[in-house]
């Protein structure tokens, strides 16, 4: 079990941010000086600063990262971050207030992302998100080992599939196929689609 110090270190927004509001003060300075600002976070705390955003929203885009609609999967990969429901609510609140919003969907993972991806895309369109950015799992030395450990511990029935995709040469085939499926599904939708791969 992780120590409380480790848990705090892994939170999207540190407890100190709530007290000192450093991000809020930086955001205010950027927007007051007409600096184009893009915020990407996993935290619904971003809505705390909506009053500042509304003063100069023309130079601002705000995005939240979501890897899946499934809270069980989310807890395994992002145990200390806000729930998917809280993130979607934040995106909706920002969009409803005229802030340009986007969603970073990544890293996309077999089954974890796939099973709820199409529903997630529809939900994001309905709440007014203007752009979806998709990214693959960047397999680096040691990272796929860590990923396989998480899968083995939490989803042993998926271990063989993940081993095949991330160590057995199916990596690019999987992501190329998924990219084509996403492009087909998103054709005619009201948002821009961007891929990081």
Predicted segments, located by residue:
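Conserved AdoMet/S-adenosylmethionine-binding subsite of the radical SAM
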Residues: 1-174
């Amino acid at each position: 079990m992780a120590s409380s110090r480790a848990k705090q270190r892994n939170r999207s927004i540190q407890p100190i941010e709530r007290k000192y509001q450093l991000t809020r003060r930086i955001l205010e300075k950027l927007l007051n000086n007409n600096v184009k600002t893009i915020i990407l976070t996993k935290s619904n705390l971003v809505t705390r600063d909506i009053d500042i955003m509304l003063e100069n929203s023309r130079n601002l885009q705000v995005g939240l990262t979501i890897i899946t609609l499934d809270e069980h999967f989310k807890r395994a990969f992002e145990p200390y971050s806000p729930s998917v429901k809280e993130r979607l609510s934040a995106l909706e609140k920002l969009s409803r207030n005229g802030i340009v919003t986007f969603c970073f969907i990544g890293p996309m993972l077999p089954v974890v992302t796939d099973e709820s991806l199409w529903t997630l895309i529809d939900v994001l369109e309905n709440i007014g998100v203007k752009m979806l950015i998709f990214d693959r799992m960047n397999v680096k030395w040691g990272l796929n080992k860590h990923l396989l450990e998480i899968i083995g511990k939490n989803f042993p029935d998926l271990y063989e599939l993940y081993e095949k995709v991330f160590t057995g040469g199916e990596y690019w085939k999987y992501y190329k196929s998924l990219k084509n499926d996403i492009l087909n599904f998103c054709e005619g939708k009201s948002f821009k689609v961007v891929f990081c791969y």
